[in-house]
Curated annotation (Swiss-Prot):
Family statement: Belongs to the UppP family.
Protein keywords: Antibiotic resistance, Cell inner membrane, Cell membrane, Cell shape, Cell wall biogenesis/degradation, Hydrolase, Membrane, Peptidoglycan synthesis, Transmembrane, Transmembrane helix
Catalytic EC class: hydrolase
BP GO annotations: cell wall organization; peptidoglycan biosynthetic process; regulation of cell shape; response to antibiotic
HAMAP family per record: Undec_diphosphatase
Domain of life: Bacteria
The protein's name in its UniProt record: Undecaprenyl-diphosphatase
Annotated source species: Polaromonas sp. (strain JS666 / ATCC BAA-500)
Other remarks in the entry: Bacitracin is thought to be involved in the inhibition of peptidoglycan synthesis by sequestering undecaprenyl diphosphate, thereby reducing the pool of lipid carrier available.
Subcellular location as annotated: Cell inner membrane
Length: 277
């Protein structure tokens, strides 16, 4: 297989791994990177599933102890049952709205103005959420995911649906949404990552079914390179972020989003990127 193509696959894997779990929208960055690398044909649609799989493996590895303990305790312990129920309840809204409106959103909302607007608006919402907790730390009433109720989980799940709008960021919506709903920065981030597991698996399986005609055994090496680089970069990114939020806010990501929104418009107006799915 062409070495240049494998290098592009590695770069795309790193982009996915570094952006999937940060509040900056992996979709927007993958579109831009794919356009700049010339890696945005039909094959890229299936490739996205491979690199997303790498990110899923990474978050499972980071949280494996909690996941394993929950599965073992699920038949007998109420806390484990409550946690599993919360993740399931938060997952359902995205499934329902995705099946109902996913095609319409892809057809009508993947435009430069929408993508740029959501980047910028999301940036200002992050600034607001962080300033709100800074002024009044008491608004963070939930400091551990185990303390969440089903209603808390449902609200986070509803907020996650906003990530269907391109440029929003799934992790950004759930983390910042969780903070605005009363979760601490750490609790919101942890729950966002737990929720990512069924959400990304569900989206991947659905996409794999839709794009099954594009699958080819010849592309396996390409997909494996992307998966491995995505896995490693996502694992490093998650571990770094969990350390970072223990003493820092998400404000730098807010300014990054605002700046990136300007980049989206500039690349679209210049014709460098078409910003279509």
């Amino acid at each position: 297989m062409d070495i240049a193509l494998l290098i592009k696959a590695a770069i795309m894997g790193v982009v996915e791994g570094l952006t999937e779990f940060l509040p900056i929208s992996s979709t927007g960055h993958l579109i831009l990177a794919g356009a700049l690398l010339g890696f945005d044909d039909d094959k890229a649609k299936v490739f996205d599933i491979a690199i997303q799989t790498g990110a899923i493996f990474a978050v499972i590895l980071v949280y494996w102890q909690k996941i394993r303990d929950t599965l073992v305790a699920l038949p007998t312990e109420k806390q484990a049952q409550q946690f599993a129920l919360n993740v399931l309840v938060a997952f359902v809204p995205a499934v329902v709205l995705g099946l109902l409106f996913g095609k319409a959103i892809q057809a009508h909302l993947f435009t430069p103005v929408v993508v740029a607007s959501t980047f910028v608006i999301g940036g200002f919402i992050i600034l607001w959420a962080e300033k709100r907790q800074e002024r009044n730390p008491a608004v963070a009433r939930i400091h551990e995911v185990e303390a969440m109720t089903v209603m808390d989980a449902l609200k986070v799940g509803l907020v996650q649906c906003l990530a269907m709008i391109p440029g929003t960021s799934r992790s950004g919506a759930t983390i910042i949404g969780g903070m605005l709903l009363g979760l601490s920065r750490k609790a919101a981030t942890d729950f966002s990552f737990y929720l990512a597991i069924p959400t990304l698996i569900g989206a991947g399986v659905y996409s794999l079914y839709k794009e099954r005609a594009l699958l080819s055994v010849a592309d396996v090496p390409l997909f494996m390179v992307g998966l491995v680089f995505s896995f490693v970069s996502a694992w490093l990114c998650i571990r770094w972020l969990l350390r970072y939020i223990s003493s820092h806010s998400f404000i730098p990501f807010a300014w990054y989003r605002i700046a990136f929104g300007v980049v989206v418009l500039a690349t679209a107006w210049s014709g460098v990127v078409t910003w279509t799915p």
